[in-house]
A protein has these predicted regions:
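Bacterial N-terminal signal peptides
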Residues: 3-15
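A subset of signal/propeptide-processing and intrinsically disordered low-complexity segments
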Residues: 16-17, 72
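Exported/periplasmic ABC-transporter solute-binding proteins
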Residues: 20-54, 58-68, 75-78, 82-251
Length: 251
């Protein structure tokens, strides 16, 4: 009922917009594929254009503190949005969980990944790609997984760090690492099918839940288009897209 109210409010708000605007949205790298579809739907309904800037959540935090022109942040964690609100860089009471991410062990090679637990324990590979745990929440989740399942000291010498989850994926896709811990959304299509290679979905008991929060930043506080997108992100059309890419949804 709450989401229905949000969507009705959005429809009314869009009717009052005289012309389309462009909204600057900083998007955690794992969420780019669904975001492209969501922003297309939003443009069709509202006339507003979304400018997607993708990267690591930790890096976005630093850029926002330095005055970057982002109006909305779609983070890969909960803490960053909360911190920005507490520090006065984002609007209070606008943060919400838009997706719950899932981590996968993925290889571009078919049949390379079957039993992920056994593969990580044996560590018979040369390189494993992991996002920088200091900048990327998916990297922190990957590090937790490796420490839980494998001999981390032995694995550490094999780790290749990507600045964000997109670069981590590229290391594996190009063969610079035999496998990597990446986001499920990166390796499946919009119908939930594996696009290529082989994967093992990491059980969520091995890492802290990847709850991903959006927040309206100060630069978007007075922008009708930014507020409209925050509402649209919680609408049923957006939620259906998010779910198709393998994410969990908040109630």
């Amino acid at each position: 009922m709450i989401r229905l109210g949000i969507f009705i409010g959005l429809a009314v708000g869009l009717a009052t917009v005289a012309h389309g605007e462009e909204v600057q949205v900083a998007v955690a790298a794992n969420f780019v594929a669904p975001m492209q579809q969501i922003s297309a739907g939003f443009k069709e309904r509202s006339g507003h254009q979304i400018s997607i800037i993708s990267g690591a959540t930790g890096k976005f935090y630093a850029q926002i503190k330095a005055g970057a022109p982002f109006e909305i942040l779609l983070a890969a964690d909960v803490a960053t949005a909360a911190k920005l609100v507490a520090e006065g860089d984002a609007v209070a009471n606008t943060s919400f969980t838009y997706a719950i991410g899932k981590l996968v062990l993925w290889s571009a090679r078919e049949n390379f990944v079957a039993d992920g637990v056994d593969l990580l324990k044996r560590a018979t590979f040369d390189h494993i790609a992991v996002a920088n745990p200091k900048l990327a929440p998916y990297g922190a989740a990957a590090e937790q997984t490796l420490k839980t399942l494998g001999d981390y000291e032995a694995l550490a010498a094999k780790i290749v760090h990507g600045e964000n989850i997109a670069q981590t994926y590229q290391f594996v896709a190009t063969g610079n690492a035999e496998l990597g811990l990446v986001a499920l959304s990166q390796v499946i299509d919009e119908n939930g099918k594996l696009k290529s290679g082989s994967m093992w979905i990491v059980p969520q008991k091995f890492y802290t839940p990847l709850r991903q929060n959006a927040v309206l930043l100060n630069k978007g506080a007075e922008r009708a288009a930014a507020k409209a997108f925050m509402a649209y992100l919680q609408s049923e059309p957006a939620r259906r897209i998010i779910e198709r890419y393998g994410y969990g949804l908040p109630p």
